[in-house]
From Swiss-Prot:
Keywords, sorted A to Z: Cell inner membrane, Cell membrane, Ion transport, Membrane, Potassium, Potassium transport, Transmembrane, Transmembrane helix, Transport
Job description of the protein: Part of the high-affinity ATP-driven potassium transport (or Kdp) system, which catalyzes the hydrolysis of ATP coupled with the electrogenic transport of potassium into the cytoplasm. This subunit binds the periplasmic potassium ions and delivers the ions to the membrane domain of KdpB through an intramembrane tunnel.
InterPro entries xref list: KdpA
Name this polypeptide is given: Potassium-transporting ATPase potassium-binding subunit
Keyword presence, Methyltransferase: no
An annotated Gene Ontology molecular function: P-type potassium transmembrane transporter activity
Subcellular location: Cell inner membrane
UniProt membrane topology term: Multi-pass membrane protein
HAMAP family the UniProt entry points to: KdpA (MF_00275)
Family to which the UniProt record says this protein belongs: Belongs to the KdpA family.
GO CC term (a single one): plasma membrane
Amino acid sequence: MNTSPGIELGLFIALLAVLNIPLGTHLYKVLDKEGKTVFDPILKPLENLTYKLCSIDRSKEQSWIEYAVGLLCFNFVGILVSYLILRLQSILPLNPEKIGPMAPHIAFNTAISFATNTNWQSYVPEKQVSYFAQMFGLAVPNFTSAATGIAAAAALVRGIVRTEMKTVGNCWVDLIRIHYYLLLPLSLFIAIILLSQGVPQNFNAYVSYIPLELKSSLANLPVKLPQGPIASQEAIKLLGTNGGGFLNANSAHPYENPTPLSNFVEMLSIFLIPSALTYYFGLSCKKLGHGWSIWLTMTFCFLILTLSCFIFEQAGNPLFSSLGIKNQLNMEGKEMRFGIFDSSFFASVTTLASCGAVNSLHDSFQPLAGMIPLFNMGLGELIFGGVGSGLYGILLFVILSVFLFGLMIGRTPGYLGKRIGSYEIKMAVLALMIQYVLILGLSALALNSSWGTAALGNKGPHGLTEVLYAFTSTTENNGSAFGGLNATSKPFALLLGVAMFLGRYFVLIPILAIAGSLANQKRYASQTVFPTGGWLFIFVLGATIFLLAALNFFPALTVGPILEHFMIGMGKSF
């Protein structure tokens, strides 16, 4: 893409800010069960019919425990259905390539992966998943997992806003309205844009052809060109910050991401809902300035990390100098139509959000550039983050910032008129510690096992980074990978599945517990010690985020990508 990096980045942020207001306002209406949207004339009858068929009383609200149980049951049923579809796809329709059943341990890993919004892929979609399984076993969880995250965020926002109430909403009403009024219309719109750029949408059998370079060779072997309903799945893959590709090359494949314009639209789609949720939060608590302050904190962090990734990658490979190569640019693992900036830009966007879609190979980045996507995920997927999970993730850090600020000035911590007590802090720390323990603990377990070291594609610090990246990606529900790691073995598939499951649901429960606790509190007029807007808020929140991430991950990063960077400088590679 020939556009100046500065212009493209500026346009991206400007569009994100402009779209924040209408989409955030729409979210506010969607997450209010009495809210009226522009889609009511078409979708209201369908919504009411769904309530009737499912025997849902929309007027009844739930405690945080009931809300959590509802979300968990909804997701567990989804995991089971996806698993069965993947195992039985050989006898199900829409399978022109006669693809057989997926192996049990891979199906287990995949079902959990898509239900938890991770979309880690330990399989080759073109060879191992039928059209039916793609649409019903994988695309449907793309919607349900996104709706789950948004519903959990809405429950936390209600907990902050409400006073002396024991309920945080109705999970079934939230899930239905999020699907009908938000995800489906947006997905249709993005799918049409992608179709206009050349993304396929069909049910044809794969096309056999002989590439030009093979016609003159003795091989003369036909190659199969995949087909399928790609555009429809691509849209929700991005909007729902899911990330699982219809094709193995993901958004590097021209069928999923054919042009620079489609690339820009895909990146914008990833951040669209997480960004708008900050405006929804500001509307809900009647403090738009506070919502914008959170958005600015996210944006500043995003700019710093994106530019760092680009600068590190643009510096090139120092090993080229010893080979007499003048052009040191590292184009390995990158598409020529995107180049270094758009590859670095996409990598930063997809790892700051819990998306995991890729348009380049992160494993081929220079050590410090590859460290940025890893560090992004280690922050906790809260710089815009996943749909829903980004908002409740950063609100955890707001609560911790409030607590630390209150301790420093000797005042009882308070946030938007609510007291932040020991219970809220314990739940917030529990949600964060679960992630850190899983990432570092499971990485250590894999690196100290024979099956773990046997899966390494590279030795030395790069091999350590591959394993650390895998468990960070799965625990934080991102799904991107350092491709040098062979994670298809039974131990890896099962352990990564456990990481995804615990990293999603064992974080969700403390979030909803905080929502229930805050909703039950009175609002104290004087309980606003911590500023909810301005540069002090942005600085304290940003510092808290980076401080906690640095304390937890810096030791691992020093013996991984940082060590590899210095060793490459000395002429050693892995």
